[in-house]
């Protein structure tokens, strides 16, 4: 690992703006799930590159954290820390990554920075998944809340040809994407592209099935891309309660937030004077089902 560089805030005082000079060197600037092409002057070094990252992603960066710039090395087939004294001389791909892992996740949710992921709530799973009817009910409540608050929703279906479509109880009105998949994780190229179109996304609220497979793999992949993940415990389940329990324990240890549907919805409105509070209050007046799910988190 390269030596620690100055914090982003220390370099934010000036420098290159969003518009690079014509005739510059093309560079692909990557951060989290995003990738944006731009150009920089020939010979641009570390400080100029940081300024360019700031111009592209400044509203998504914690300005007090330290980051490292990495270069994609063709000979290794992966990113490596930017060599000391590096200067841009040809087309290349760079990414900005945190130099140190955050040990504490605050878990603040706001509607403009949040996306809901509903994972594989399909008909063929109904007889196999524990408390499936309960998680459908809670999942539908979450989707109603998303519509009220204008939060984008992405839904996937695992091999729908064999496992059927999303259950009829789930209302797909206003959903941004419904995608078939064979991969267990929801992080498909189409999902990454959809996230890139939504400015300022920091958090994903994740629910569905199965906790220890598709939910777990989706959560870990999102966290690896710098997205904060909230798993809704009363809206996710597995065929085996043991698999579910140990998956949630493992995910919580990695800094993923295990929460409930009511906690999510009330955190998103945050204030009784919020213009949508009454509608959200009506949603949660009837408590979520008291199933065996929450006794086995």
Swiss-Prot record:
According to the UniProt entry, which residues carry N6-succinyllysine?
A: 278
Carries keyword Phosphoprotein?
Answer: yes
Q: Write down which residues bear the modification named Phosphotyrosine.
A: 159
- Gene Ontology terms, cellular component aspect? peroxisome
**Record keywords, A-Z:** Phosphoprotein
Q: Which family does it belong to?
A: Belongs to the isochorismatase family.
Name this protein carries in UniProt: Isochorismatase domain-containing protein 1
Upper lineage ranks? Eukaryota, Metazoa, Chordata, Craniata, Vertebrata
This protein's gene is called: Isoc1
